[in-house]
Amino acid sequence: MPQWSKLLSGRFIHRTICFSVGVALLVTPITASAASSSNGKYQNVQFAAEQSGKANFQGSLLTVGENRFLTRSNIEKEWDGIDPDYKPDQAVKAVKELLSLEDYEALFPNRLGSPAWYEIAKGKEYFKADQKDYFSYSNLIDAVTEVANIKLKISHRKGSPGVQEINRLDKDARIETLVSRSSDFNSAKNKKQEIVTVIIDFGTFLKEGFKKDRKRELAAFLANLAHETGGGWSTAPGGELKWGLFWNENIAGRTGVNTSAFVDEASAALYPGVKDKRYYGRGPIMLSWNFNYGLFSSIIYGDKNVLLKNPEIVSADGKVGFMTAILFWMTPQDPKPSAHDVIINKWKPSKADIAKGLSQPGFGITIMVLNGLEANLGEVEGSSVKRRAGHYRDITKTMGVDITGEKVDTLGMKPF
């Protein structure tokens, strides 16, 4: 699960990445600064209160885009250390012991760029002669490996979850980078407010809990992605579930039916769109809008400009595509927990959650975390939940996991 430095709640760029998987919602982002590539000098960053008559709570002394090398002592004190079980070299084992290459390819035979996809796509508008196996098993493993090298620290002023700064830690290099900061984070008023911090170790993906729960996590992750990228229908050859992971671009955006550049003017100063580049939905979570491309670029590369200048990377490189999905899966967005915490049974519902019917940790609640628009739906014909749950049942069966009694739909649930 995401590792918490305190029993705190955090929001992943409050109002910036509030899209549900597959349904990007335009919400005006906060005014902030974001990282472009920069090398900085070592600075002694303090996260405790300074006493000068009244408490003055100081955040990072780095400027946005600046980085510093950390000693092991710094990492222990400021980042809760680095757990060797969650390092990148454990990623290959983490995936392979849960789902084999053969089973993965049998579950998704028509995935984008597979031999079966080429037969289906031949002569179609979307056919690409050079299409690679985007959702390949190796790309999944590479993504799990690469995200395992990243920790994220989200800090906000107490009572103001939108007043944030975000730091990224490269574990192997022991380099910390300040990737984003609200413009008013260190205002005179806000400096009087305590700093609330959450630390997320992306290396915990597929590596926490009993083996059954780790299998359920991979199944839930792939089931939700398969639904969002599915190309099947009820009478599709081989069955609808064999058509998961078929698409990786929003069709209207790709074909130009929707010509929007998907640049939100309110965030353009922070995450400027590049001329002739369009930020329509790409990848397994259909990453959309300039502010999301810039933010995810900052987390993956430590530089907002990589994906702002080259948004097509998300749909061209399957490893990067899977990385965007894992980052989204692992990160809580107050008041929502992360899907990771839910599926491995680390999330404990609050009284408010229980009142909304959000009381049974399982696949159904991961749907609510990812897309609250699918509340109160059962596994009935025409329901999006039917296909999500169908994929989950199919994958867990392949894994040999018994999910009897697990709530896999959203009946009786309201959004967080």
For the regions a language model picked out, list residue spans one by one.
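Alpha-helical segment that forms one wall of the substrate-binding/catalytic cleft
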Residues: N139-T145, R278, R282-A355
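Glycine-rich (often Gly-Gly/Gly-Pro-rich) flexible segments and glycine-rich loop motifs
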Residues: G244-N290
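Bacterial N-terminal signal peptides
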Residues: T16-T28
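Cell-wall glycan-active module
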Residues: P2-F12, L26-A223, G230-V263, K336-F416
